[in-house]
């Protein structure tokens, strides 16, 4: 049976970057678990902000820099920066470290794989037709400049008795070409029939390497 390598891990350091930019041999486990908790706190607090990823840097043992990439930065920043200040204080109290929170706007969320996956999951949870949702997401991505896109859903689709997998592909998707810029995202839709998994691949062109 064929096995597929993770699109992000396959290209780390070439066309994709790390989500954690630090190294500490002594406290590696502690920092790794803390990173996941930081991401969980921010994502749960701003679930409506369209957060694609959170990159964490640690200049030293006392400071943490969280770079939040979002489609709706205004929700996180708040009026006159009040919301982001409150977030920083909450994180400092919870983790007992100094925090710097930077927000980066995602200009074209229609071609961001993680945001596409979460949007598809959200629509499926609201009982929209998964076929219509997938086709619309593909149309919007191609319209905004994607070179290719694949969306795959797995589970008891439309309440079927037997779980199955369906996918739609538009354009090119050269997964084995290492210079290809492939964005990858996953999400889950919790329905009354069970969990539906969503995977999204977006091909954005080739890097000059």
UniProtKB/Swiss-Prot annotation:
GO terms for molecular function: mRNA binding; rRNA binding; structural constituent of ribosome. One of its GO terms (cellular component) is cytosolic small ribosomal subunit. Residues 38-107 form the KH type-2 domain. Disulfide bonds: none annotated. Keywords: Ribonucleoprotein, Ribosomal protein, RNA-binding, rRNA-binding. GO terms for biological process: translation. It comes from the Bacteria. Gene3D superfamilies: 3.30.300.20, Ribosomal protein S3, C-terminal domain (3.30.1140.32). Binds the lower part of the 30S subunit head. Binds mRNA in the 70S ribosome, positioning it for translation. Belongs to the universal ribosomal protein uS3 family. NCBIfam families: rpsC_bact. Part of the 30S ribosomal subunit. Forms a tight complex with proteins S10 and S14. This is Small ribosomal subunit protein uS3. It comes from Thermosipho melanesiensis (strain DSM 12029 / CIP 104789 / BI429). The gene is rpsC.
């Amino acid at each position: 049976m064929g096995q597929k390598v993770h699109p992000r891990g396959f290209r780390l350091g070439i066309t994709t970057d790390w989500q954690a930019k630090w190294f500490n041999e002594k406290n590696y486990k502690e920092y790794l678990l803390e990173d996941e908790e930081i991401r969980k706190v921010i994502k749960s607090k701003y679930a409506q902000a369209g957060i694609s990823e959170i990159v964490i840097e640690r200049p030293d043992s006392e400071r943490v820099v969280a770079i939040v990439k979002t489609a709706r930065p205004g929700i996180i920043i708040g009026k006159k920066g009040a919301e982001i200040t409150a977030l920083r204080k909450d994180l400092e109290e919870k983790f007992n470290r100094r925090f710097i929170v930077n927000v980066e706007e995602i200009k074209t969320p229609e071609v961001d794989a993680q945001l596409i996956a979460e949007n598809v999951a959200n629509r499926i949870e609201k009982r929209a037709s998964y076929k219509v949702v997938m086709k619309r997401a593909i149309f919007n991505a191609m319209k905004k400049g994607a070179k290719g896109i694949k969306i795959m859903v797995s589970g008891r689709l439309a309440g079927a008795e037997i779980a199955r997998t369906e996918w739609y592909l538009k354009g090119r998707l050269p997964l084995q070409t290492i210079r290809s810029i492939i964005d990858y995202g996953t999400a889950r839709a919790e329905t009354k029939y069970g969990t539906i998994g969503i995977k999204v691949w977006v091909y954005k062109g080739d890097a000059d390497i």
